[in-house]
Amino acid sequence: MTPNTDLNIPLFERAKALIPGGVNSPVRAFKAVGGTPRFVKRARGAYFWDANDQRFIDYIGSWGPMILGHGHPAVLEAVQQAALEGLSFGAPTERELELAEAILRLLPSMQMIRLVSSGTEAGMSAIRLARGATGRSKLIKFEGCYHGHADALLVKAGSGLATFGNATSAGVPAEVVQHTLVLEYNSIEQLERAFALHGKELACLIIEPIAGNMNLVRASVPFMRRCRELCSEYGALLVLDEVMTGFRVAPGGAQSLYARDIPGFQPDLTVLGKVIGGGMPLAAFGGSRALMEHLAPLGAVYQAGTLSGNPVATACGLATLRAIGQPGFFAALSARTRALVEGLRGAAAAEGVAFSADSEGGMFGFFLLPALPRNYAQVLQTDSARFNQLFHGLLERGIYIAPALYEAGFVSAAHSDEDIAATVAAAREVFKTLAKP
């Protein structure tokens, strides 16, 4: 493919004249890696085809929702039937209840749930609920964790532990983020000091239990245990952002994994998205009945949405949850993801490339580092130029990973053993070309 024949190039030029940066979400622009984004014409199973009709093995899967692969027959049938009945009503439907019941059966920490349309909306609403329920304003988040683009959560670390955060986006007033304290992920020392200084002012602590916006970094069990203990001790709410991990890493989300090692572990609030919508705009947040009844129309915490509980989106989500609930689904998905990660490790080792990787369920991450990082500062040690070489080398060979070194990857039920083998073979070819550090 040459610049004169690549149909993605004129599409991107056209897009840049119409849409800021040519995309409707920044990471899609390939700004971090350079080059031209692939414009998708269609997708099926583990693959998509771009404007040139070139096929790619897709490890983004719409950034996580497509756990069954693209165009799963049962999901398409459910969506088509729902669309025939009506696209949107702005009124309750029985399917909303069925989806709520399906989610609550899988997450014992949640007794009630509120459906919304995006992960950002769910995270923003959970923070508002935490503040309304506790009567407090301050919150803790962690470097490298992303909770959507709500103003209070677009924050980077201040100059010291006791310094509240600075906005990472223009247009966010300083007074909005002055209540947000940013700590190092996995640092029990910083966590304990923060609660000692501000514990009685904290409405909540929000965290990605497996941080997929640092590629993939796990909260250690001792760290998560201490988060739970300190929140309980000081009356702050523990909010788990499982937009990415919910029903992706295990049937009960990441919280079920921590509950195996921390007796009685449960968050106060959980934020969900991606998989629960199956590829449609749908997200949710939920918790105990006592907390959720602070929401309007029962309580004083206002939250609303024209398209919340959309009938087509709930049909898509319900069909997806039913499919992933089949016996053996997660065992097979986890095995295939592990096979990919182990294959990539072996390919890198064979070519002498520093490489580390991890996976859980259908989610994986890798680093061009000799050991897995534990926090954002360690993630930043990755050589971005080498990652860009790897990204473009794989892209040329028909393998599509995230066009940014800080994003996790996703395997679907549609990925075959042959897809995994082809990916590992392509990666080994690219590893040969990487300049040795």
From Swiss-Prot:
The modification N6-(pyridoxal phosphate)lysine is found at K274. GO terms for molecular function: glutamate-1-semialdehyde 2,1-aminomutase activity; pyridoxal phosphate binding; transaminase activity. Pathway: Porphyrin-containing compound metabolism; protoporphyrin-IX biosynthesis; 5-aminolevulinate from L-glutamyl-tRNA(Glu): step 2/2. Its EC number is 5.4.3.8. The keyword Isomerase applies. Its cofactor is pyridoxal 5'-phosphate. Keywords: Cytoplasm, Isomerase, Porphyrin biosynthesis, Pyridoxal phosphate. GO terms for biological process: protoporphyrinogen IX biosynthetic process. It holds the Pfam family Aminotran_3. GO terms for cellular component: cytoplasm. It catalyses: (S)-4-amino-5-oxopentanoate = 5-aminolevulinate. It is an enzyme of class 5 (isomerase). It is found in: Cytoplasm. Belongs to the class-III pyridoxal-phosphate-dependent aminotransferase family. HemL subfamily. Homodimer. This is Glutamate-1-semialdehyde 2,1-aminomutase.
